[in-house]
């Protein structure tokens, strides 16, 4: 495992972080984590050098906004001495905060759920410019100062889902350990993007990358045109390796989180992380990413990462699964609902009443109502 320094904190973190948003589950319910398998995976990662584990209040909840099962799982998985071997990160659920007092309530509950007396990196979850202004006015900076002073957290940070212009403003507002951004070879100009990443690095602020595989989409099912571009490279790599090496090539990236849901994901990511050197890609290899980007963007319909923030839909539409089917159909140029996975979607696009609630919650800013119409027309329901 290779290690990098987290911003200006002096803390050495593994290039690969274990994200606990997409743990293996038993059945179809997000809250039913497969404890034995997920524990085996996280222990294997730690034994092979991973020293950073990321979770959040909402992860593995039945519906977004509810307390999920990821934090309790992590607390149990890191018991019996494993906690001391990692840097633990979780997040303040700013989306449901109403008062300054709520911040202490949530942090204290998270410490209990995680079975620990402190959190190494405590993030404000999912900031946009508007959300930042709101929580700042609620007193979040005073809260973070107090939590650092009393030892409940070591370093403050934030995750970001806003517009590019808001990222530097937030970076400059406080003494952050890092900003966590969505970044991969498809999202170089999306949200904070490469410009935001490099701005943070210039300021001595670390960068943690989420969605380096774009919710798994860059690991499997690449369009044939995109795969053909990578196949021209002198050095042959798997799709996940191309994706992760792009992220790790940036010197300003402190670590990349991967939400691993199977042991084979852990094994492959550990292998790739052993070669995670900055500035290690050749100019020719970097040029291939631009070609792949064009090939993929010419096909997909919705830049959805399946984060689940749009759920539950009041009308019962399974929005991430609907969009996944739409994209699969577009990528393979086939409207066969079986091939795209649409036959397994119970809450189809035709249930949409165009209330717009999903679009208000979507971190990607997708025109979900229009996409539901398109999907219903394509698949007939």
Language model features with spans:
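Conserved, mostly hydrophobic/aromatic
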Residues: 6, 18, 45, 53, ...
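Structured C-terminal cap/extension of enzyme domains
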Residues: 41, 46, 51, 195-381
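Glycine/proline-rich, positively charged
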Residues: 94-210, 221-227, 234-235, 249
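Structural motif corresponding to the early beta-alpha repeats
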Residues: 58-59, 80-100, 125
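N-terminal binding-site loop/beta-alpha segment at the start of enzyme catalytic domains
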Residues: 1-86
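Short catalytic-loop micro-motif centered on adjacent basic/acidic residues
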Residues: 52-58, 154-158, 180-181, 255-257, ...
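Conserved residues at the C-terminal ends of beta-strands
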Residues: 19, 56-59, 122-125, 159, ...
